[in-house]
Amino acid sequence: MVRLLLLVSLGLCCLLASADRPPYKSSGIYEEEPQLPGASDLSGGVASDEIGVAPAQAVDERYRLPTTSIPIHYDLHLRTEIHRNERTFTGTVGIQLQVVQATDKLVMHNRGLVMSSAKVSSLPNGVTGAPTLIGDVQYSTDTTFEHITFTSPTILQPGTYLLEVAFQGRLATNDDGFYVSSYVADNGERRYLATTQFESTSARMAFPCYDEPGLKATFTVSITHSLSYKAISNMPQKTTTDIETDMRTTFFEKTPAMSTYLLAFVVSDFQLRLSGAQRVYVRPNAFNEATFALEAGVKILKVLDDHLGIPYDTYMPKLDQIAIPDFAAGAMENWGLVTYREQALLFNPAVSTYRGKTNVATTIAHEYAHQWFGNLVSPEWWEYIWLNEGFATLYEFYALDMAYPGQEYWELFNQQVIQYAMGQDGQASTRPMNWNAATPGEISALFDRVAYDKSGSVLNMMRHVLGDDNWKAGLKAYLTDRALQGAVDEQLYAGLQSAIEGKGVLPNGVTVAQIMRTWTNEAGYPVLNVRRSYDTGDVIISQERFYNDRKVPNTNIWMIPYNYVHQAKADFNEFDDFQWLATKAARIETTVPANEWIVFNKQQVGYYRVNYDEHNWELITNALHENWASIHRLNRAQLIDDAYWLARSGRLDLRVALRFMTYLRNEREYAPWTAANVALTYFNNRLRGTAEYHNFLIFVDALIEDIYSLLTIDAVSPDDTLLHKYLVQTISTWACSMGYTDCLMKTAALLKAEASGTGPAVHPDIASVTYCYGMRSALESEFQYLYRKMMNSKNLAERTMLIDSLGCSNNKEFLKAFLTTALGSGTGVEINYRADERRRVVQAIYSGGRTGVDALIEFLMDPALVNEFVSTLSTSTLNSALSAIASRTNNVEEMNKLNALITALGSRVNSQTAANLRTTAQANLDWVNGFEGLMLSNFLAEFAAETLLTTTAAPETTTVTAGPTTTTTTPSSAVTTTTGPTSVTTTVVQTTTEEDDGAATIGLSIAALLVSITVHLLMG
């Protein structure tokens, strides 16, 4: 039985994340439409080359290098004295190149380097012969296009030449190019290292080069550095030579042909762990945190070797991993030397969470997959970056699942990749998978959710269509054919096609290329509409492009592989029954009885949504109420996600979607609850702070009551599976947010026991929920304990979690004091934060709930503090904070606070920014009275009324429990219920998030969404 929650003052803004860590071909679907078995065309038309294909966009080709010369080999030498924090470096590079068209100009890339000298020689006997000096060359730079032009004293006829250049530069401080990083040693000394991040266009910051992915060459690298430091690069060390009294030059073996963006080198005092040809480098005080990364790397490389049939050591003799303290991305797949941010490689069982371990494992799998997809075969141009990132995203879960069978890693793919991709790809502004770019900014923008998650989803769909054996054979053919070269999408299709010729895998006359072009050249994705004729058994299916927030007529046509199950034949695990929709609509003949449900897209392997007529939705809903496990868990998750987004787009009555979600009262598995978390978080964010919010909490309470009662939230068992841990975190977060006394008391007790020394440290796997909700009622001593724990920790993932937890406090004075530490003020000593951690403090406070938002507003109202805020954290951080405040503004009182803040900030907020902030906030206020808001409110009111009828009569005295303290009130007509695991409390909702990163390049979000503090009882 559900408890009736009557709530007045509630506050939380929830943030969903996943994570983490963004030339077009004018090709149509097919020349002549093939006949597809099992479906008759209802559209009356034929898919053509023009229908639905995204138009080619104009790009500035002046950013591309001329094709008059191409590189063959680079002989690169660099000298750095980073051991004493010297930021200048010097270098020389000898570039063997082929002139293919007579010219006197050799044009390459350069960003910020200063040339000292340059000369050109001919190589009449090829690259192995002695050079013949032609003379010194003139050079000029173009900072707009980042080109450097070397002009020869004579015309260079087609042939082989050597360009030798001396240069100098400065190590960057923005985690890009050749840059400086640092860490604090155990003795308190700050130690420096020099490292690289060249993808996508930053090799040109370290040496002049042909910095395009298709222009592959071999490299020999040598680096002069301190004797106390070690240099590593893509290839094994060949030899060393000591020079001067304290310097050494390390020489490396010659690389295979590779793209410039894959070159890497690190100069540091790091230590290593070794297993065969694999090594993991870490700062000395993190040495014991490298064990899992080494173990996982060995396992994952072995399964990829076997799966792809091309052993890694065919081309590369070693594979190193290194954790860099300052690293902008999640990781970088440099061939033979993979670089990571520390949180994506280091694992400490004493403090790291199950999510942290999963992030490490998936990131390693992602980067190891790149050793084939991106390194062995690189995209000819950034237009095809999905050939790298799509495969890496697929295999970060698939390879990990093969390496650790039975650990349930593959179960994460649907929620963290497919459903997340659809949420992003349903926007009108999305792009096709194939998409041209020219400028560095445009190229960087291609590393988005289309390149990663959508592409991984589409490739997973094709893997299921072709079958695993054909898939592996096709990939081996593709990789073998294009090894050490660039590739375009059509070459992948040819490789896959070669594996299925004559096998009848696809309909007669249909090719892999014809299918894939509709998915790679088309923006967005389809919704498959299913309408049943219950009298005849026939089913009409049709397709249209899906938009998240609207229903727009369109002519888009995809070749959609579909299958279906029904109640009497629920064979969800069979994938040899695909049929195809290649037109706008078709009729399917079935014998499914009218009283049985039908579900399309088994296990959601197809990258599309499915909508049904309302009666079929009703049949599905009723079936799940009777037996929640009668439909496969991944399809239950799909149904929840589809119903939610279909309702938001206007394709499905919102009440139908919400009625369907009521089956969650009985749901016991991770995947459906994670899908539901997305929908519930959206509704929570919209309704928080409104009069309708208490009805929403009644609804959520009804859904989670039973599952919460079955879970243990204050202890971790060795038998707990990965998915069980995800489920516990999701449900316990909602339960504590809903004010479940049991949840709040347990989290508070665990934190208090640890802080006072009367109990053990909280287990890492439940720490984020425990610390956050324990912090709601924490005293100053407990707040200070957690703050000191954060400051003393050297594990960056743990520090981030603790920062987020401190932001959960309900005490505005605590929060404002916490903010001052991010500015380095208020203590008289330097605060040991990294730059990104200072920004994280701000994020944690405004994400912690309405109390945190109000604390931030009050803080920024102080002119002296806002000046220091901008000086320390930058104007962009201020703007991000203002945007967060506006997005968390849901009522008139909160709007007044926002307006007062904008006024107080004066010229720091320009008129356009102020208008945008007010527009965002007003849209939140208007939503509740719009169509979607009214539909939701109506359903929730009816649900609450029905719930009230089944609720026991209230006693005169109501006990409201928040954490470990109890307040008793006696209103004239108080209402409570006492069934279930808790008595009535008031609260705000926080939801869990998925940390992606899987994709390894994907940027990172907050692990927990935090709630407000004030507890009130609605007085009758």
Swiss-Prot record:
In the bilayer, the protein is annotated as: Lipid-anchor; GPI-anchor
What is the protein named? Aminopeptidase N
Tell me the compartments it is located in. Cell membrane
**Assembly with partners or alone:** Homodimer.
Q: Catalytic activity, per the record?
A: Release of an N-terminal amino acid, Xaa-|-Yaa- from a peptide, amide or arylamide. Xaa is preferably Ala, but may be most amino acids including Pro (slow action). When a terminal hydrophobic residue is followed by a prolyl residue, the two may be released as an intact Xaa-Pro dipeptide
What is its biotechnological use? Potential vaccine candidate. Antibodies against ANP1 prevent parasite P.falciparum development in the mosquito midgut.
Q: Which residues cross the membrane?
A: none
Show which residues form the site (Transition state stabilizer): Y452
Binding annotation for substrate: E199, G330, A331, E333, H366, E389
User: Which N-terminal residues, if any, form the signal peptide?
Assistant: 1-19
Catalytic residues, per the record, are E367
Q: InterPro entries of this UniProt entry? A: Aminopeptidase_N-like_N, Aminopeptidase_N-like_N_sf, ERAP1-like_C_dom, M1_APN-typ, Peptidase_M1, Peptidase_M1_aminopeptidases, Peptidase_M1_dom, Peptidase_M4/M1_CTD_sf
Does the keyword section mention Protein biosynthesis? no
**Native species of this protein?**
Anopheles gambiae (African malaria mosquito)
Q: Spell out the molecular function terms from Gene Ontology.
A: identical protein binding; metalloaminopeptidase activity; metallopeptidase activity; peptide binding; zinc ion binding
